[in-house]
Amino acid sequence: MKNQSDAGLEARLTAPLEIMLASFAPIGIEGRDLVRRSFSGAPQHQPSGAAIPMDPERNQARLVASGWIARGAMLNDGRRQIIGLSLPGDVIVASGSVDADLLVWALTDVVTVDATAFWTTLSEPGAQVSPLSEAWRRCRTAERLRMARQVVRLGRLNAYERTAHLLLELHERQVRLGTARGGALHLPLTQDVLADILGLSAVHMNRTLQQLRRNVLVDYRTGRTLLQDLPGLVQAANLSAVCGPLIPPP
């Protein structure tokens, strides 16, 4: 039987996931308790830049309790392309050959916890329908939508549009977590990392951020960024509604 200290630790580790799930659909006390019971093992701490150990042989999943994680590819000449970001509350999974050529690493100091039981319970075919499973289904749909957005960003948008759209997407995600207030955005990403996400050179990234600042849309600082004009950024992103709403949920 778990003692009070263990239960308190689990609640802190799973709090971002609980908040995010509840932003998609009510999960209730029963759903919250199931989330907390679904995680096992000691939390793992990795410093910024470290690889996140995953075991694809057993489709291991991990919950991001704190910090930011990148998934992407490293080219032979040292260039990187980041294809996805995992924030607190996200669950990452090693899916064998699908991710064989991708790296997963910490962009900041991170804490993760084994989420394999949670992933198996809710993601397997025939999983019991419940308020929690519905929230998880919507969460996974949003994740797939983010991947589609990234493809459109890299394939069809210019640097200005890409940057505006990425910042809006990160703001939307943080509103769901309750960590964004107004236009204030937690952004622990350097310009080099932003360039790796958006497929730009460091020089082009810097010029684009300066242009957004001159247009009084974004005040960028590593660690904390202010989105000064959300409707203006939506217009600058120049994406149709087919790629999903970028106005944060209430």
Regions found by a protein language model. Give the residues of each.
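Polybasic "coupling" helices that flank or enter modular domains
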Residues: P131-I197
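Cyclic nucleotide-binding regulatory module and flanking cytosolic helices
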Residues: M1-A51, E57-Q60, V91-I92, S97
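Cyclic nucleotide-binding regulatory domains
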Residues: A50-T108
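Phosphate-/nucleic-acid-contacting segments
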Residues: R173-P250
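Cyclic-nucleotide recognition modules
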Residues: G84-R149
